[in-house]
Amino acid sequence: TRQYEESKRSTFYDYNDLFPSLNATYKLNEKQQFRLAYGKSVNRPEFRELSTSVYYDFDLGSDVMGNSGLKAAYIQNVDLRYEWYPDNGEQISVALFYKHFKNPIEWTYTMSGGTDPIYSYINAKGADNYGIEVDIRKNLDFIGMKNFSLSFNGALIKSKVQFAAGTNNIDRPMQGQSPYLINTGLFYNNTEKGWN
């Protein structure tokens, strides 16, 4: 067993934020359009990220301590999308996206008196994510699968975090950010019988 220090300190956090968004659509014809979207969002620290209590993380195999000085991360999103609707219930879209993070929350670690690191959280200076996304939904009637449709979504993502000068972290991709995402699904929808 291991003895951990107990803290009775409490902290109050107060946030007053506005999150504007804008969506604009330009129709090329009845089946094709461009869509431009902007939005601002927030990623507030979780309780475990703020708590100065030390706990053992079995996945890391190490102690983890929160950081009560963490700030909320603010994200600005821009998305330019081309959409085509070839048939009822079908869609093909291609999007370019960009996200800028202010104060993103990232992992860091320090070496304790022994040789085991203690992991914690810090606010990086900023981060940028950008990439391309493809979204397809196709009815499968043409191969005899009436009422079935197949969906596919894939994205390629480039990510980079910038840390403040003087830290022991180097610029790298965001922690936990995959360089690609792939999703697919098979759907059944029978409006006559009310099944889906």
Where on the chain are the PLM-derived regions?
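Structural signature of outer-membrane beta-barrel domains
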Residues: 1, 31, 41-45, 87-89, ...
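Residue-level detector of the transmembrane beta-barrel scaffold of outer-membrane proteins
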Residues: 1, 21, 25, 33-35, ...
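Signature of Gram-negative outer-membrane beta-barrel scaffolds
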Residues: 1-29, 55
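Outer-membrane beta-barrel porins/channels
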Residues: 13-15, 19, 29-31, 59, ...
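Residue-level signature of outer-membrane beta-barrel architecture
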Residues: 24-28, 40, 84, 138-140, ...
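Outer-membrane beta-barrel signature, preferentially recognizing the C-terminal barrel domain
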Residues: 42-93, 98-101, 112-139, 175-180
